Amino acid sequence: MMGEAIKEQILAVRDTALTNMFDIPAVQKIASDMGYFELVLFLEENRKAYVQFILTGES
């Protein structure tokens, strides 16, 4: 399950406008640079839930 903290971190990375949000390795790099290590790990284990959130805004 995707918690509120993960959602907020995804939105913060998106707001940087530094990458396409479907470029997951780039999202992980930006998240790491921002100190969002929980998001980096989440993306390793929950890519399907992440893509669903990006596409629909729902988790």
Tell where the protein language model's regions lie, with residue ranges.
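N-terminal acidic leader/helix
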Residues: 1-26
